[in-house]
Amino acid sequence: MKRLITVMTLLLAMPVQAEVQTKTVEYEHDGEKLTGHLYWDDAKKGNGPGVMVIHAWWGLNDYAKTRARMLAEEGYVAFAADMYGTGKVTDKPAQAKEWMLEVTADVDGWQERAALGLEQLKKSGLVDPQRMAAIGYCFGGGTILQMAYSGTEAKAVVGYHASLPAAPESVKGKIGTKVMMFHGHGDKFVAPEVVSNFQNKLEEADADWEMVIFGGDVRHSFTNPDAAKYGIENLKYDADADAASWQRTLELFKQTL
């Protein structure tokens, strides 16, 4: 009887769960019109922590938006940023590569566009600017690293099956954000020597970093349940690695935000 009363009391005390709200945000960088998407739970009162999501090289597709929604369901204000331009989404590797190279060819511009995305999150009026982070997938993982190298306001950056641009010597002692990366041992897009160099350069830069490498046949796009639809052998979903990386990410945000 005591247990029943306790459970009933808890149920009565639980607030009505609000639905995640969403808003389209239009902005511009270097003549390119960009369209991002903001997600938040309006049951949350006051300015809280915010997380920017950077898409993979396919563009700002439903997968990136889904991750932003998942963050909102966890109580974060999330912004799915656009790094390519309004409507630039594809499932064709050649087109994806073209758009990606257009952005990454100018590293300063690449960093500026990422910072502008974070600025949209801050300008939402829903976020405490001292409690922001960013996550990114594939190309987006490389993008959040560029944010770290350029002195981002984000307290933490997290990358999944990311390209791994090494920290330049000029940022030694200047990386003020926590860097966390999740990588698959079976990812043939990133050579072992690239991984080693990436780790060494972060260490030389005196960065606060952590890298989780999932062993076995964990490949690129291990977080994406639809990875196989692209028909690329190196893209493969791994439910265990997906769940583990997401859980560790949420733990990190509880610690840093």
Each predicted region: which residue ranges?
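N-terminal signal peptide c-region/cleavage motif recognized by signal peptidases
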Residues: 13-17
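Serine-hydrolase catalytic machinery in alpha/beta-hydrolase-like enzymes
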Residues: 24-123, 223-236
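Short alpha-helix in the alpha/beta-hydrolase fold that links the catalytic acid
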Residues: 67, 191-201, 211
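Primarily recognizes the serine-hydrolase "nucleophile elbow" in alpha/beta-hydrolase
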Residues: 114-175
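Short, proline-enriched alpha-helix->beta-strand connector loops that line the catalytic pocket
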Residues: 174-179, 205-208
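Short beta-strand/loop motif that positions the catalytic acidic residue
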Residues: 181-183
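Acidic catalytic loop of the alpha/beta-hydrolase fold
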Residues: 186-190
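C-terminal catalytic histidine-bearing segment of alpha/beta-hydrolase fold enzymes
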Residues: 203, 208-257
